[in-house]
């Protein structure tokens, strides 16, 4: 089995790791950083930029720079979460034919899995550059509180990126694997994971290589992006109060505010006060305006107080579901960049009554855990058993619009559960199975995962036919549902890609598009390399021609000048082969010029070396004689 990489596909940053010599290693990207911004930009020329390159140009290209796409993955355009995003995003979020939230950039529509796939391709390339071989197998992490649609969409993103996704693993569970791999004692731990876009809390029991998740809870729309937004709103309000100008209408200014908010938030984790300086942020009739504000840690904590308060509820619920009290927890592991905020650490301490454990790197631990799980699947890591859970209850709609649960939340996966249902009317020929996920009592308040129909039921009074509905959740947390008429043996099943999500045809098309772009990127790189080499050749040839042009005859000189002109013309185009051909022709034409340069350099070299002023032939003979003598000595 080939190498298996572990990828933490984050809202703000992503990270890739691999097992080497029994140890997990985080791989640095081409820019030398161990984490990569989860950003994608499309330039005027149609070039795709991913990671740091995309982030660098975000201020000047806000409408075509995509970030925090993970918050759209597997979500409906009409959902409350997406409506919130639309209100604050500089890029365009549109409704797809299937009702999903997609993005539109430069007139072209992209699904969230497609954009996420571009980030995954970057992580794949990072691993391949390090290993020196092609990588196809991967373990990808998702927030523990992701529902089925979001998990399926993440798996689709992996497929589009050219990866064989062996397992989708929950982020807190991955962090627990990384933390507990070398721990020998039995302990109960809480993994508190507050990242760029999502918040998860998982309670686990560790012992003898068994990692058992007891419960999980969270909020898939609470993270660093929300903290940044609150800071942006405060900066914009202060500037409006001072200057009377609302910066929120200017996308370029808004992008600068976003960068400043993120920077200030990070700085206030280690200092008590920071300056926010943004010169030339805008202008009016009186001239340019500059933004200069002081932000203290106390003020930041007041600005974000409502978000901090939201962290407590899921923690209490997770403890209750696990049947534990805060005193039963041995360690609280902090995961995600947001846990560096002192106020977050204090909140964790208040909830659990103990100082949180900061022994793991919050940015890298999830990718490390994913790599360990890859090692388990590959057989490199022995004696590790991971028992994860499904975060939300699963069931179907029954008479009266009620949700009847078949699998309760926090059930260990993989799992399978069946229940017998019947018809609601006499001689009912078919039953419609409405698959739901959620904790509310009425089906309309829960998330629809899919609908399918079991038809061909023989005429019978209501309540007589026996329809067995079976739910099957695989190790990725992805749901399969089947319905069987026990009287006829007729069966109908659905693998939930549902009304939400991409069809197989759409995924296949996106895979082809991704491959095409990969070869396009290769061609672009070849063109840039050819241009660089040609530019260097043209410069050195012109320099030599200026110095030694009088040492060669006019016909040779003209041939070189023609070659130079042809090369410059080829460089204006975008045909790498034409540039290479013109470069080769110029090199051929420049042979006489090279001889002249060499001849000029030769006497100088001889004098420098103290060589006698004799002909070339004599020099050659001396070398030959030396060579012969050495050979004879050897004999």
UniProtKB/Swiss-Prot annotation:
Induction: By stress conditions e.g. heat shock. Keywords: ATP-binding, Chaperone, Nucleotide-binding, Phosphoprotein, Stress response. The gene is dnaK. Coiled coil: none annotated. InterPro entries: ATPase_NBD, Chaperone_DnaK, Heat_shock_70_CS, HSP70_C_sf, HSP70_peptide-bd_sf, Hsp_70_fam. This is Chaperone protein DnaK. The keyword ATP-binding applies. Belongs to the heat shock protein 70 family.
């Amino acid at each position: 089995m080939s190498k298996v990489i572990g990828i933490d596909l984050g809202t703000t940053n992503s990270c890739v790791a691999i097992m080497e010599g029994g140890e997990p290693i985080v791989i640095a990207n081409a820019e030398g950083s161990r984490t990569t911004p989860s950003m994608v930009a499309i330039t005027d020329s149609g070039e795709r930029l991913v990671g740091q390159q995309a982030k660098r140009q975000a201020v000047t290209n806000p409408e075509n720079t995509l970030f925090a796409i993970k918050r759209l993955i597997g979500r409906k355009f009409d959902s409350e979460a997406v409506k919130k995003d639309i209100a604050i995003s500089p890029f365009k979020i549109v409704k797809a034919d299937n009702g999903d939230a997609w993005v539109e950039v430069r007139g072209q529509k992209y699904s969230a899995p497609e954009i996420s796939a571009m980030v995954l391709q970057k992580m794949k390339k990072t691993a391949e550059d390090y290993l020196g071989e092609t990588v196809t197998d991967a373990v990808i992490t998702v927030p523990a509180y992701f529902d089925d649609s979001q998990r399926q969409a993440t798996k689709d993103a992996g497929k589009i990126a050219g990866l064989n996704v062996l397992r989708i693993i929950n982020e807190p569970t991955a962090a627990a694997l990384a933390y507990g791999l070398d721990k020998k004692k039995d302990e109960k731990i809480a993994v508190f994971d507050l990242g760029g876009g999502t918040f998860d809390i998982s309670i686990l029991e560790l012992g003898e290589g068994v990692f058992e998740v007891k419960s999980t809870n969270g909020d898939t729309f609470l993270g660093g992006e929300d903290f940044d937004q609150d800071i942006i709103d405060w900066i914009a309000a202060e500037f409006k109060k001072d200057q009377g100008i609302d910066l929120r209408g200017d996308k370029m200014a808004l992008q600068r505010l976003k960068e400043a908010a993120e920077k200030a938030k990070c700085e206030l984790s280690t200092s008590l006060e920071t300056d926010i300086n943004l010169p030339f942020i805008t202008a009016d009739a009186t001239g340019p305006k500059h933004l200069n504000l002081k932000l203290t840690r106390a003020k930041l904590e007041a600005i974000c107080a409502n978000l901090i308060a939201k962290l407590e509820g899921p923690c209490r619920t997770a403890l209750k579901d696990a049947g534990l009290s805060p005193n039963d927890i041995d360690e609280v592991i902090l995961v995600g960049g947001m846990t560096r905020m002192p106020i977050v650490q204090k909140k964790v301490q208040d909830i659990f009554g103990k100082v949180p454990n900061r022994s793991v790197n919050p940015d890298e631990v999830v990718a490390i855990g994913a790599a360990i799980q890859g090692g388990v699947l590959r057989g490199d890591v022995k004696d590790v058993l991971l028992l994860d859970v499904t975060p939300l209850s699963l069931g179907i709609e029954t008479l009266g619009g009620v949700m009847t649960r078949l699998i309760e939340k926090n059930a260990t996966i993989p799992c399978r559960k069946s229940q017998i249902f019947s018809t609601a009317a006499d001689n009912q020929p078919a039953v419609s199975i409405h698959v739901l996920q959620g904790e509310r009592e009425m089906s309309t308040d829960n998330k629809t995962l899919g609908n399918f129909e079991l038809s061909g039921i023989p005429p019978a009074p209501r309540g007589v036919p026996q329809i067995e509905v079976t739910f099957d959740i695989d190790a990725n947390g992805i749901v399969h549902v089947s319905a069987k008429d026990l009287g006829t043996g007729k069966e109908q099943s659905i693998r939930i890609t549902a009304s939400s999500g991409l069809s197989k045809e759409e995924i296949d098309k996106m895979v082809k598009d991704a491959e095409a772009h990969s070869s396009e990127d290769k061609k672009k790189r070849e063109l840039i390399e050819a241009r660089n080499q040609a530019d260097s050749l043209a410069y050195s040839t012109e320099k030599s021609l200026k110095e030694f042009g009088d040492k060669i005859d006019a016909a040779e000189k003209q041939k070189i000048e023609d070659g130079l002109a042809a090369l410059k013309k080829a460089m204006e185009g975008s045909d790498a082969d034409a540039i290479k051909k013109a470069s080769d022709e110029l090199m051929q034409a420049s042979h006489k010029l090279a001889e002249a340069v060499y001849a000029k350099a030769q006497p100088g070299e001889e004098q420098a070396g103290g060589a006698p002023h004799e002909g070339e032939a004599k020099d050659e003979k001396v070398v030959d004689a030396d060579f012969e003598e050495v050979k004879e000595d050897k004999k």
